[in-house]
Amino acid sequence: VIASPTVIGGVNGAFEYMRDYPYYCWEQKLSKGTMASHYNNLRPYLAESLIWEASQTLPTQTIELAKEYQAPNGGMAYFVPQDRRVSPYLSAYTALAFNWLRDAGHQVPATVENKLHDYLLAFLRKDLMPDYYSRDMASSVRAVALAALATHDKIDREDIKRYQPHVKRMDLFGKAQFLAATLQVPGTGRISDTVADLILAHADQTSGKVSFNESQDSGYKRILSSSLRTHCAILSSLSAYDDKMGSRSKVGDIPFKLVRSITQRRKNRGHWENTQENLYCMNALIDYARVYEKDKPAMVVQSWLDKEKLG
């Protein structure tokens, strides 16, 4: 019998998976370092037997490693830091991860981050897409860049309005990232409402769970897309939207149902499928807990097997 007053309980397997798997490319190393940072901050929620000895040094080591994967144009590459090998999605994801690491108290070198932001700003304003990016994929990746840059006040209401017509092209992951961007930019409340409604229109609800459905072509694998990653990005954005909008929000109990869907997707493995899913899902559970688990629970949990009291 496992009982926990928080959705963050029972996630030991995700940390074990990220701790033990051998990582080689920048995305994997960055995800592992960020997950180690989460481990340090969430230690009271985790089993005492779960030990990650390198967790105290790994986040800083990972940040310092970033320059080895940064191309001259400021973008990030999986292996070789050359302009022609830069991945727009990986670059936007790196900027997001830097934000998460900074929120956890880590310092990000200004030279690396500023070059990265300059690349992303150019990416937003010019046609710098790889040939294999469809227009829909490009719109979704731009949304990730907007979400990352909004944290630093490097985009404004006019930028949001400029990209709003492209929301219809974005997949649900992109829509969730665009919603996250709008929530950080003053004067975009109506746009936030519109995007939230577009996301909610894809919800398929049952009595206890919810799923968000869409069709994608195989090209989205180039930006590491998966249904579960999308669901986790939606949970983060809808939780933030619900918190900000208060009584105006139409979200209802969807975040609660979405948490159930996400946690059950681990099945018997204790973790999700890959680095992207484990990190986005962990972030989503943290974001959910921050909004909906603010109050300390007052409860007593007891269990019986037939008439025998277990505890």
Please provide the spans of the model-predicted regions.
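Extended, solvent-exposed functional surface patches
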Residues: 1-136, 142-153, 157-160, 176, ...
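Long, domain-scale non-catalytic interaction/scaffolding regions in large secretory-pathway
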Residues: 135, 140-311
